[in-house]
């Protein structure tokens, strides 16, 4: 079953901590977003393998935008 990591708020990607093909665990940090002058660490929702990373460093993201797909 696929799981998506969504941006909880609009902001700018300041770090991408995982790559396509990585094995990840629930709770692991995946992406760091700068929003309202605060860095927000977005975590992996479930164990799995990264199927796709849809954002890159300095990308602007919208609220609820899909950033990563986990299989």
Each language-model region and where it sits:
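A structural signal for short beta-strand/turn segments enriched in small hydrophobics and glycine
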Residues: 21-30, 35, 58-67
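C-terminal accessory/binding modules appended to enzymatic or scaffolding proteins
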Residues: 6, 10, 19-26
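Short beta-strand-turn/beta-hairpin segments enriched in glycine/proline and small hydrophobics
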Residues: 1-10, 32-45, 70
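Short histidine-centered loop motifs in beta-beta connectors
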Residues: 15-19, 52-55
């Amino acid at each position: 079953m696929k799981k998506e990591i969504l941006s909880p708020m609009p902001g700018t990607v300041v770090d991408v901590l995982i790559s396509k093909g990585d094995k990840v665990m629930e709770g692991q940090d995946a992406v760091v977003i700068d929003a309202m002058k605060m860095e927000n660490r977005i975590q992996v929702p479930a164990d799995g393998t990264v199927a796709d990373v849809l954002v890159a460093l300095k990308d602007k993201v919208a609220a609820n935008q899909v950033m990563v797909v986990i299989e």
